[in-house]
Amino acid sequence: MKKTIVALAVAAVAATSANAATVYNQDGTKVDVNGSVRLILKKEKNERGDLVDNGSRVSFKASHDLGEGLSALAYAELRFSKNEKVEVKDAQNQQVVRKYEVERIGNDVHVKRLYAGFAYEGLGTLTFGNQLTIGDDVGVSDYTYFLGGINNLLSSGEKAINFKSAEFNGFTFGGAYVFSADADKQAPRDGRGFVVAGLYNRKMGDVGFALEAGYSQKYVTAAAKQEKEKAFMVGTELSYAGLALGVDYAQSKVTNVEGKKRALEVGLNYDINDKAKVYTDLIWAKEGPKGATTRDRSIILGAGYKLHKQVETFVEGGWGREKDANGVTTKDNKVGVGLRVHF
């Protein structure tokens, strides 16, 4: 490559395109830069109002044309904020009396995703590294900005190998294997596992239909032992013009641990026009063995509006109720106003 890294960085900063900026494109090599700043002003039950980072990022994508439909690719994504864990200790005996997390903004620039691999035209993409897996693609009912979602699959991995096929008449499939963080044979195998998924999306005129399903297994620590968590998720969506109805069901079970986790999410979204939308999500969930089950019920309402094709604003509220095995109900109410500026 004739350009230096410094030159690429300068070009990326200087780029003013509203879409992903191509900062280098020569001799079959292409480098794109894009990102977004995502902020939410929120209020939760029993907490003061707060302003938080909701995943602001800058990403760099490079591809090299190797000929015959084959290309090599690389991707890096930077994030800017991390929560800080705080412990409050008793002044006399120095014992921890309370733990909580502080949501910071711009306190920690770090690499969130980093992977490379190959893409073959008409076949698919195979990538290696810190990335989302195809399990993250499963789910159709979450139309929210930050409160919804019930995906229980192995959806990402720091050390992952992921394959995703090209689209064949609306059908896409794939799988991923995730290594544990530590290769030492004596170390815990937490997070190691695999996921497979199939996605079908088809549109005929104003009518759209989607059917998605996935299955995963991964190691977790339960009762001081390494056990396998088996999970599956299935969802379907039907849409007509600007109206869409989606339903997802997720279930997971840890080997040798009583009880299962089950969740059902129903979402309804209406695009008023190409700028405005309104939506609602309902979530039912339960967890634990028979006789000691915890049940959750949530309703989410929201609206989004695009001031520009690259500028999103939204307001979203959620009202949750959790009932434990003793019948005690705990309320969990949240509301947020958000802004996302893409570049």
Swiss-Prot record:
Membrane topology classification: Multi-pass membrane protein
Alphabetical list of Pfam families matching this protein: Porin_4
UniProt GO cellular component terms: cell outer membrane; pore complex
Annotated Gene3D superfamilies: Porin
Record keywords: Cell outer membrane, Disulfide bond, Ion transport, Membrane, Porin, Signal, Transmembrane, Transmembrane beta strand, Transport
Residues making up the signal peptide according to the UniProt record: 1-20
SUPFAM superfamilies in the cross-refs: Porins
Subcellular location: Cell outer membrane
GO molecular function, one term: porin activity
GO biological process, one term: monoatomic ion transport
Job of this protein: Structural rigidity of the outer membrane of elementary bodies and porin forming, permitting diffusion of solutes through the intracellular reticulate body membrane.
PANTHER family, A to Z: OUTER MEMBRANE PORIN F-RELATED (PTHR34501:SF2), PROTEIN YDDL-RELATED (PTHR34501)
Subunit and interaction comment: Disulfide bond interactions within and between MOMP molecules and other components form high molecular-weight oligomers.
The protein's name in its UniProt record: Major outer membrane protein
Record organism: Pasteurella multocida
Gene that produces this protein: ompH
